[in-house]
Amino acid sequence: MIELHTDNLEKHFIPRPNAIWPNKIAAAIANDNEIVSSGITTVFDAILVGNYTKIRTSILDDIITSITRGKDLGLFKADHHLHYICELSDPELLETLEKYSDNKYITLASLMDHTPGQRQWRNKEKMLEFYGKGSNFTSHGAYDFDERMLRLEETAKEAEKKNRPKVSTIWREKKIIMASHDDTTEEHVNEASKNGIYISEFPTTLEAVKQAKKLKMKTVLGAPNFIRNKSHSDNVSVNDLVDNNFDLVDIFSSDYVPLSLIQSVFKLLHKGVNLSESTKLVSYNPANSVGLDDRGNIEINKRSDFLRVAFVENTPLIKEVYIKGKRVN
């Protein structure tokens, strides 16, 4: 299976709030083992570039270094790629990108806008609920968060407006594929399409999903959302999308639960989608969307990446994982 967006690596760097794991290579290898045991053979590690939380900013260099060194030294079983999630509302984003944008393992870059009141966080109460409970964002409770939200709103809109064209130019000149993140309205999708972007990652509304498909963009939806029958942040239900029109969903992403990818394939089976079509959402379609033509299906002269899966109490259990024809798990 091919995973285009997972931030699972971050969990191994911050296993508990404010507890940073000191050995970055060990954290990256632990993540790789979890990824492979979940049946993922090609993984795009989603790295948040530009952020407001000090703890996530503090591990950025170590996270990027861990993947880079792990790749250079051949330490991983899965094929890892860097997927930069660019927070356009961060006024310091361009300075951060200047330091990290030349990494040879960057394959995908998403343009994200987490301005309070916009896109995923158009419901500010949900943003407060998501961030306000954890010490990663504020150590002074909800009142401090409200004050910070007001300040962020004032600066974030200006930063997003400045950053979007410049960041797009950076990736276009480097020939890095771009995705639009958390599209909410037709206007968001239209803007992305005009910018040459053909991947809509985690569109948050039915309106955005339909517009993306109308413009022949590839839609990436969250597998955890599909398995749970709802979004963790009140976005459109992927289960409802599938029931409404299976063709609205091109690609599944495990996002924050690696095992959700294989579970989604078999949930589709239970809904009457045949195995070939359901498997495409985690194999051929993601590979094709990012130009990985050597994988995604089993053919002569392509990588022999495949799984053996059994069922235990109606749950898919990954028994064996093969990468390039060699068993790795």
Regions found by a protein language model. Give the residues of each.
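Active-site-adjacent C-terminal substructures of enzyme catalytic domains
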Residues: 82, 177-293, 313
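Hydrophobic residues within beta-strands of alpha/beta enzymes
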Residues: 43-45, 109, 200, 252
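Metal-associated gating/positioning segment near the N- to mid-region
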Residues: 1-62
